């Protein structure tokens, strides 16, 4: 891999990895084969507009999208290859796969809960990773996530009991990321968990995704496709 450009919407008088920050996004993107995006939803959509115009591949690690924004991303994927993941960690994506298998295997007597802890600076909740895991639970039941949690409960730190999937989000300190999925009945609890110790695992995953995306046709892909999970 070769880092060819960095973009920023503010002016900084310094270099990163020996490269000056470029304020002209479109001009900067012309130098790249793949664009890796870790920003905020509004910026992601702006990036996709330019990438679509330039026919550039995009890896999206941004989270916190609304359903409308998700729909716009799907439209852009008809023009360019896009890989989108709420978490770029290979381990977390394996956790999602195992979550789906567990959900499919267990009957409705088991209550599903997603518990996540992140640093105090993280704004969205439940986190993109927590929602990924929630989708894993829903997929295992052949259901839509939103039908199981209810739209009115999105963007809340705690989902009240009584829903099919319960989320509990905590923001404190400088914790990189802890996630746990629990399936509980009156007789037992099954727990699947993942803890991140180094943020480099996210950049490693994003670079792996970018390399994988190089030879792909237009479409919306996920880490599940990259890892070749069934």
Task: Spell out what each predicted region is.
Residues 41, 62-63, 88, 119, ...:
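Short loop or secondary-structure boundary microenvironments that flank
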Residues 38, 61-62, 185:
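Short, well-ordered coil/turn residues at beta-beta hairpins
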Residues 33-34, 57:
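Structural motif
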Residues 34, 46, 72, 97, ...:
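Alpha-helical scaffold segments in soluble metabolic enzymes
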């Amino acid at each position: 891999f070769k880092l060819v450009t960095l973009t920023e919407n503010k002016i900084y008088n310094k270099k990163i990895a020996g490269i000056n920050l470029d304020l002209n996004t479109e001009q900067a993107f012309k130098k790249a084969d793949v664009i890796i995006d870790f920003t905020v939803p509004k910026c992601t959509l702006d990036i996709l507009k330019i990438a679509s115009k330039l026919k550039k591949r995009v890896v999206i690690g941004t989270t916190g999208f609304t359903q409308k924004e998700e729909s716009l991303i799907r439209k852009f994927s008809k023009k360019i290859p896009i890989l989108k993941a709420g978490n770029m960690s290979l381990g977390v994506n394996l956790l999602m796969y195992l979550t789906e298998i567990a959900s499919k295997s267990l009957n409705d007597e088991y209550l599903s809960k997603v518990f996540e802890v992140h640093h105090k600076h993280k704004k969205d909740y439940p986190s993109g990773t927590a929602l990924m895991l929630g989708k894993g639970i829903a997929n295992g039941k052949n259901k839509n996530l939103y039908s199981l949690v209810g739209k009115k409960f999105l963007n809340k730190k705690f989902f009240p009991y009584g829903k099919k999937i319960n989320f509990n989000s905590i923001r404190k300190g400088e914790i990189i990321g802890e996630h746990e999925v629990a399936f509980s009945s009156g007789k037992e609890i099954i727990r699947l968990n993942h803890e991140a110790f180094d943020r480099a695992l996210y950049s490693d995953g994003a670079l792996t995704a970018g390399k994988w995306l190089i030879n792909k046709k237009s479409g919306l892909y996920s880490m599940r496709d990259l890892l070749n999970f069934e």
